[in-house]
Each structure stands twice: as C-alpha cells, then as structure tokens.
Amino acid sequence: MVRNQILVLDHNYGLWYERRRDDHERVRRRDGDVWGPFYEQPFARSGEGTAWEGLSKYDLNRPNAWYWNRLKQFAEKGAEKGLLLFHENYFQHNILEAGAHWVDCPWRSANNINQTDMPEPVPFAGDKRIFVADMFYDISHPVRREFHRKYIRQCLDNFADDANVVQLISAEFTGPLHFVQFWLDVIGEWEKETGKKATVALSATKDVQDAILNDTQRAKLVDIIDIRYWHYKVDGLYAPEGGKNLAPRQHARKMKVGKVTFDEAYRAVSEYRKKFPEKAVTYYAQNYPDMAWAVFMASGSCPVVPVADEAF
C-alpha cells in the first residue's frame, strides 16, 4: 500500500482464502472439495456437524481468533505507516445476488449450530440468485438480533484501541433504515459502557443517510459521511431507496445511473460538508477516481488525488 501510495484498505471478510467456493460460476457445489487456506470468517468452527463446504459448523457465539488477530495486526502495522482500515462489518453480497456466497455463509442455518432460522432449503431464484437480505436485516427476530448485537460489539472490541480503523456497516450496503439505526444503537451502547470512541462512517443510500443525519442522537455517533450508494448526475439525482432487497448493481439495472462530472461530485461533497461541518465526507460513488480533484476542492477526505510529488 505504501509503495503504491494507497491510503485506505476497504475490507470485508473473508481473508486469504481459496476462492473456488465463491467464484461466481453458475453451478451448485456438490461437496467441499477445497484446498487450504480456507475461507476464514469472523466466527470459529464448532467441531460439531458438517457445514455445506465440508468442515464443521460455525458457532456464532465464538469469534475466530485467527481472523480477528490477523486484522488487528494489519491495523497496527498500518498505523505505523499512516494507513487506514475501513472495516466493513458485513458484506451484503453474501445475502443478495450470487447464491454461491450464501451457501457457505456462517449465518445460513445449515452452516451453524445456533438456530438462526434462515430458510432451508435455500430459496434460490432462477436456480442461482439469492434474496435473503430482508430476513437477514429483520431485527425483530430475537435470535438473529442477539447474534447481530454480539457480532457488532466484537467488531468494536477488536479495534477498540486502533485509531486508524473506521467502522462501516457493510460493503455494498443498500439495506433498510431500521438496521442502520440498530447498528448505531449498539455502537452507542458500547461506547457508553467502555468509555471508548469508535470512528464511524455512515455509508448507506441517500434516504437512509439523510434520515440518520436528521436524527440528533444517532447523528452524534457518526464521524464520517461516506457518499457511495448515490450521486448527483448531470440530469438530476441517482438515489436508490434503501431496504428494497436489491443490491447496488441491481438498482443500477433498473434506474438510469447517469453521467457524473466534476460539478456533480463537488456539489455532493460540498453540500454535506457545509451542512455537517463537524463531520468528514468521503466520496466513493460513480466514477470516483476521476472525481478526486472535485472531492479535494470540496473539502472531502481521502480523495484519490493522482500526485506523485513527495513534497505535495
């Protein structure tokens, strides 16, 4: 990262793994014929039963010590070099779009010993797609709600003393407002109990983002506004709604994404910086690498400014 002048690693699990189980081929895997290193997940194996890929089932009550230690080591080494870890707590692609991700996911009922009550057999759409985000984000389910709470707290505990780690809710997140509210409430409870402060980035669709920022209590927990799942375009606004059980790519097929120029990127960052001057704003929306100077000039953070001059 240092050699290539990269400031941020935007990370979602898993880590350092053999990819044949989720390589997006349009076939179902009959068995667990895989090679190590295996797809490391945040949860430890239970030693009981057999998960879909042939190893023992996960225990959602037990963190995977190797996984969390590995990430913490990266954060600590990165801090020495001035690097940031954007820690995506979840990966929405596991529960929307490609079914290969869900079949091995720890939250799937067949893969854990914790009775998560997700549907079996897997409700594939067209024999390959998966749409279980609405169930996954349902915090009224008492069992899954508690496991979500424990997992979010593990994300916070692991990096409690790492100032270069930024917590985000999920990669590719287009989920509902109520789940973001729940996520922030857990963070707030953790901060109150521990006396520590997490650095939190609000990364969501525009309607969800605005609702949180207009919520006085929850907005206090947000340090960074991450513009990623919406953008201004030359002929208006591209802003899919949250909680529609559709991934970013699926929204993009149904709506006109449009063209983004310097003016639109500058407008988005500038508006939120002016409205919320106490918060940083990052911009990773449509065509963001080419919008680096617009982000920079609008007082945005972490722009991909293509400058090789070491004195800059």
Q: Which residues are covered by each model-predicted region?
A:
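Active-site mouth of glycoside hydrolases
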Residues: 1-224
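Extracellular glycoside hydrolase catalytic/binding regions
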Residues: 142-150, 159-312
